[in-house]
Amino acid sequence: LHHNARRLIVCGNIPDQPQSWLLPDTPAHTREFNQDWHVRGLFMLVGRPARGRFTHKETDRNLDILVADEWFPGQTLTPVQARWAWRELTHIIATRIDRDWALMDRPGAEGINLWKLRTPESYLMEPMDPELGALIQHTSPQHRYELCVDDGHPEDREQGWRPIVPAGPIPNFVYVDGRFMYAGSVTGEIGAAPATLLSATEAHDLFTDDPWHPARYHVRFTVPSWWDDIGLLPVKRTKGRAGWFWPNVPGTTYETWVDAAELKLAIDEGWDTEFGPDGPVTKPIEFLGGIKLTKVDPIRGWVKTIQDMIDIAEKRWADKNPTATTILTSALKNMLRVTIGQMSASNPVTTTVVYDADDIPSDTEGFDAIRNKTGDIVAYQYETARRRPDPDTWHPEIAARIWALSRVRTLNTPIADPTTGKNATTKGGALRMNSRSLLAIHGDAIYTTSVPTWALPVAQGGGDDGKDGRLRVKGVLP
């Protein structure tokens, strides 16, 4: 390494297990490593880009080790490509904001700084109440991951969930995906702090008077007896792996927290009605409480700025080098997604290098041991109490709103009218197709056995006009 190097970006195909390359592989190598280097911090969670911060003990020089995948996910770049992409991305961002700008090591930190720079003057960035913020964090899913096909393991299912497609061969595999869904979901008022905790009566009155008001509701609901489709309201799992499920078994009752958009969709679909001897009867969803957000528009300008950056990248490179365009636009979209998650960041995970298992303090609870390929413990991870978050940028209520709006849009999405170019009166999405053709929902992607017309390009009579937030066909396998 050059004696002034402060950043090392690892490129190419990188192993999924960061301990296989970021940490010494034996206790002996650990002792040798610790003679020369001090570990300032490690981030090593499976499935996430690894980072390491080190200080050379003799020269007191700091060195950060990153992976190119953190900024450019899904792109296997050479060092030359990574250097070019880093510089070009820096130029595009600086051009759009019209000032000198250095690209930060992490896309989330970069996005947060751009958000603070582009936040409208009308938004005062009121801090989120820590207790309400924590409540929102613990009651809000991000993506929806759901296999709709019978996998043959009923013992692993939640009592209130059932597959809607039997096991068996399928005629086709169709991949429908949302285009930059988070950006496309920012169409109305997102809302933000200050937030107000509501009683059951106050929550009921707010939703009745203004169902579109940015809010979260604590409700008790029962899946209608006539329902025969995927579920609409998220509930935390109680068995099997952690996460969420969407109850769809008629007659099952649950309590949960939902976003206003999710609740409105459920009621629009008739979840407040039930069969009676003389026809449908009202069976209201019961309100148990709520959290009311303030009507503000905290991120639309920031989202528009990132969309402008994507346009700049496409105009500069689309005709010259489509691969370059993909690298740059994917990085910018990734920055927005990661930044939304950064707004709801939880307690950090600390990774500590050890010589052997006896070096782990006896009072450390709930740690995960990291082992090398021979089974020796070389480090351990544990969750640490979060430092006081930046009150300007810790906004789990904003993240929860965008996640919920994106989930709703995947189920019930606006489509373009091919004759007028405006939004059609009909909708697309997972709820607007034959449920027996629905294989799975994976975030803002839908896997199905038939091509939905609304997911085709406008030129082919469909509803995809190329705008962000549209669901469109990405691939078909016979």
PLM-predicted stretches and their roles:
Residues 1-478:
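Conserved acidic
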